[in-house]
A protein has these predicted regions:
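Gly/Ala-rich beta-loop-alpha elbow adjacent to hydrolase catalytic centers
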Residues: 82-87, 91
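Flexible "cap/lid" loop of the alpha/beta hydrolase fold
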Residues: 96-140, 172-175, 201-202, 208
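Conserved HGGG/HGGXW glycine-rich cap/lid loop of the alpha/beta-hydrolase fold
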Residues: 3-48
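Glycine-rich His-Gly loop
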Residues: 8-13, 85, 108, 195
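Active-site loop/oxyanion-hole signature of alpha/beta-hydrolase fold enzymes
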Residues: 35, 41-80, 94, 118, ...
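Conserved loop-alpha-helix segment in the C-terminal half of the alpha/beta-hydrolase fold
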Residues: 195-227, 239-240
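Active-site nucleophile elbow and catalytic-triad environment of alpha/beta-hydrolase enzymes
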Residues: 163-184
């Protein structure tokens, strides 16, 4: 059986997916031979193409994932697609693709058709504070490196927290307001990882969405287990690849 390619779709308000996924990418390659690629999201300003200046909405982010999946399919391969947090909403929009072998949701969402990222987050008792800027984007509001680290990466060291903070970015407001047009997780083999020490997304919200996955597993980590416990994440990926 050919080894699939792993595509990683990062969460909201950050850039450089390759950096976020790299601790797991390295261990995954070593243990399974699976190579990883990060999908760049136009809504986070991550494109060098003609659309870079205009940002993008959920549909543009989904198109970026579809393009990456088309590349995998053109090479005769299959893909495992990982969505972290907001990335799961991108998977819902674009996950029903012939190249997809498995979807992995990490502290994430499996939304119904017509859901918006903004409405999903608004149900949280202590939502991440954001504000609009003057360019049609939203930015994190009221955080510094210490408070960001304490909320999103409390199980990482200070150097990692700082490197993560330096990769936060503004995101196109439309990404939070675009209703999903598909439930791409439906009918696709999937795993949901619930992070039980997550200080960003409540365990209750994670569990409600995880019930929709083919299987779910709970890990004792903060919001970014692929940084802090790559061994546990690789263990889960290896399990469904067997």
């Amino acid at each position: 059986v050919p080894t699939p390619t792993l595509l990683f779709v990062h969460g909201a308000l950050v850039r450089d997916g390759a950096w976020w996924w790299s601790p797991t990418a390295d261990l995954l390659r070593e243990r399974t031979g699976v190579e990883s690629r990060a999908v760049t999201l136009p809504s986070c300003g991550e494109t060098d193409g003609p659309g870079a200046a205009r940002g993008g909405d959920l549909a543009d982010d989904a198109a970026a994932l579809r393009l990456a999946l088309d590349d995998v399919a053109a090479a005769g391969g299959s893909a495992v697609v990982v969505g972290h947090s907001y990335g799961g909403t991108v998977l819902a929009e674009a996950g029903a693709h012939p190249a997809v072998e498995h979807l992995l949701f990490v502290s994430s969402y499996l939304p119904d058709v017509g859901s918006t990222q903004g409405s999903i987050m608004s149900t949280e008792p202590d939502p991440v504070t954001i504000r609009p800027d003057d360019a049609g984007r939203i930015v994190l509001d009221g955080y510094d490196v210490e408070s960001f680290g304490a909320r999103f990466l409390q199980d990482a060291d200070a150097a990692t927290q700082r490197a993560a903070w330096e990769r936060t970015t503004a995101q196109d407001l439309r990404a939070f307001g675009t209703p999903t047009g598909a439930a791409g997780w439906s009918g696709v083999d999937s795993t949901a990882i619930v992070c039980t020490d997550d200080r960003s997304t409540t365990v209750g919200l994670q569990r409600r969405h995880a019930e929709r996955a083919t299987r779910s597993v709970e890990l004792p980590t903060g919001h970014h287990p692929f940084i802090t416990r790559p061994d546990l994440v690789v263990e889960q990926i290896a399990a469904f690849l067997r």
